Amino acid sequence: MDTSATSPDGTQPEMSPAVAAALASADGISDWISKHHPGKVMETRNHRLAAPYFAVCLEYRQAALLLISQNMRASAFALWRPTYENYMRGHWALNVAGDNDFQKIAKTKAVPKFDTVIKALDGKSGMFAKTKAKLWSPMSDFAHGGINLLARWSGPDGIGSNHPDGEVLDLVVRLNAYGLLASMGINYMAGEHGLSESIFVEKVSAVLSGIKALP
């Protein structure tokens, strides 16, 4: 079995112009997020729970983009799920978590399961379970060695990273959306010192206009 299709560290030798352009655009979004990151948020229990989730989402996004820039695509895709999950948990903590949730967290010293979070969010909008159902299987495969990951590391030329550029471009779009949404949550918690939600909605809509379906 030929394993020469990839270098020992799992990287690919070249980056396409399309991926390079997407990363440049993502860097611009990162700079914008950083520029509009409020220094403080209002102190409430919901904000205290939500803020770390949003912050971790932003860090994972940056890490995934860095990995893509180094052509370490499998590692970048492994961060897709936790980036998404931390944003969703932050959204739940900010907008849905109530007295019973905080009492359970204090009693059990554990946060709710992700399915519980999604169900609680669906009580408000009804769309989150459908999104999770569509994305969870490939997300989990890439994070935990499932069939989608194996299919991109085994081919006619041997064993090596073979994540198509199109999938990488879609991942960058998703990462940008999660980052902007997390930043929107942080700005909301800053009250009058944060940017208005409408500004973020416009930017997220512009980002998502180019998205394609991942497998």
Regions found by a protein language model. Give the residues of each.
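Short, contiguous, well-structured surface segments enriched in hydrophobic/aromatic residues
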Residues: 28-67
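Long, charged low-complexity segments
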Residues: 1-44, 100-215
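Short runs of predominantly hydrophobic/aromatic residues within well-ordered alpha helices
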Residues: 50, 76, 80, 132-136
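Short, hydrophobic, well-ordered secondary-structure elements
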Residues: 54-95
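Active-site oxyanion-binding pockets that recognize sulfate/phosphate
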Residues: 47, 73, 165
